[in-house]
UniProtKB/Swiss-Prot annotation:
PANTHER family: KETOL-ACID REDUCTOISOMERASE, MITOCHONDRIAL (PTHR21371:SF1). Mg(2+) 2 binds at residues 191, 227, 231. PROSITE patterns: KARI_C, KARI_N. Belongs to the ketol-acid reductoisomerase family. Substrate binds at residue 252. Involved in the biosynthesis of branched-chain amino acids (BCAA). Catalyzes an alkyl-migration followed by a ketol-acid reduction of (S)-2-acetolactate (S2AL) to yield (R)-2,3-dihydroxy-isovalerate. In the isomerase reaction, S2AL is rearranged via a Mg-dependent methyl migration to produce 3-hydroxy-3-methyl-2-ketobutyrate (HMKB). In the reductase reaction, this 2-ketoacid undergoes a metal-dependent reduction by NADPH to yield (R)-2,3-dihydroxy-isovalerate. Pathway: Amino-acid biosynthesis; L-isoleucine biosynthesis; L-isoleucine from 2-oxobutanoate: step 2/4; Amino-acid biosynthesis; L-valine biosynthesis; L-valine from pyruvate: step 2/4. This is Ketol-acid reductoisomerase (NADP(+)). GO terms for molecular function: ketol-acid reductoisomerase activity; magnesium ion binding; NADP binding. Residues 183-328 form the KARI C-terminal knotted domain. Binds 2 magnesium ions per subunit.
């Protein structure tokens, strides 16, 4: 069984007196920067001139510099930008400012694993990837807890890369919950697979198919929305708390029996074969090439798919229903 590492396994002093540059101030960026700052470390934020995030970061008491200046001033550089822009910003702003002994860090292995970013041999290259959104990383830290994280070493130029990665994980609160060691390849391929086959692609397709089946059979769209989308959270919360066993222990016998007897008719061996094909496309780099080319061409297909999905009836029904949910209404 994989070993988890905790606070006592990591030494925060390894980053004491060092300057940590957080490149980007989005969901993960703001959480990492503020948690590291509250851990007593010296943090600066790298943003492009005119970024709307400059005011937010400065209001939080953080020093903001251009990406190039932040990279130049830092010992430890964490890149928390969208995958599709990392290559260009790294090449133009970060790479020219790297020095021997620096740490180049990522929260996802995509660009390193697929060769979009090729670091020099004289820097450490590590990954620290919280397994939760930024707001949760921040909120749990403030509550004295943390979000579990993955960490990995791609290149150990200093001989301390692993310890430095664990130190950073401790600084953002990850070792409070536990951190698991992996590799850039393993994190990248499993993360992409989970997103595509289960969490995003698989779940979205399942929800829409269920909704469409009920509506096409003449049932009210509002009821179809409740049964196929709204109640997903109720089930997922149980699964997260105690696995499939707790979920099944918490639902009715009718629902549990239907789970066992009908579920395998939805996710069949053919479905699993398609999952294996999707995994192969990830492993071979086919998906990465497709995604890179799509972005290089201006995202025409991506934009069209976004527009089409936004016009699905489930979005219209959901918007109207959510407007009536008192607990979702803005104060």
């Amino acid at each position: 069984m994989a070993r988890m590492y905790y606070d006592e396994d990591a030494n925060l002093d390894l980053l004491a007196g060092k300057t940590i540059a957080i490149i980007g101030y989005g969901s993960q960026g703001h959480a990492h920067a503020l948690n590291l700052k509250d851990s007593g470390l010296n943090v600066i934020v790298g943003l492009y001139p005119g970024s709307k995030s400059v005011a937010k970061a400065e209001a939080a008491g953080l020093t903001v510099k251009s990406v190039a200046d932040a990279a130049n001033a830092a010992d430890f550089i964490m890149i928390l930008l969208p995958d599709e822009v990392q290559k260009t910003i790294y090449k133009n702003e970060i790479e020219p400012n790297l020095e021997e002994g620096n740490v180049l860090a990522f929260a996802h292995g995509f660009n390193i694993h697929f060769g979009q970013v090729v670091p020099p041999a004289n820097v450490d290259v590590v990954m620290v990837a919280p397994k939760g959104p930024g707001h949760l990383v921040r909120r749990t830290y403030e509550g004295g807890e943390g979000v579990p994280a993955l960490f990995a070493v791609y290149q150990d130029a200093s001989g301390q890369a692993r310890d430095r990665a664990m130190s950073y994980a401790k600084g953002i609160g990850g070792t409070r919950a536990g951190v698991l060691e992996t590799t850039f390849r393993e994190e990248t391929e499993t993360d992409l697979f989970g997103e595509q086959a289960v969490l995003c692609g698989g779940l979205s397709a399942l929800i829409k198919a269920g909704f469409e089946t009920l509506v096409e059979a003449g049932y009210q769209p509002e009821l179809a929305y409740f049964e196929c989308l709204h109640e997903v959270k109720l089930i997922v919360d149980l699964v997260v708390e105690g696995g499939l066993a707790k979920m099944r222990d918490s639902i009715s016998n009718t629902a549990e029996y239907g789970d066992y007897t009908r579920g395998p008719r939805i996710v069949t061996q053919q479905t699993k074969a398609e999952m294996q094909k999707i995994l192969s496309e990830i492993q071979s780099g086919q998906f990465a090439r497709e995604f890179v080319l799509e972005n290089q061409s201006g995202k025409p297909g991506f934009t069209a798919m976004r527009r089409k999905e936004s016009e699905h009836k489930i979005e219209e029904v959901g918007k109207d229903l959510r407007a009536m949910f008192s607990w979702l209404k803005k104060a």
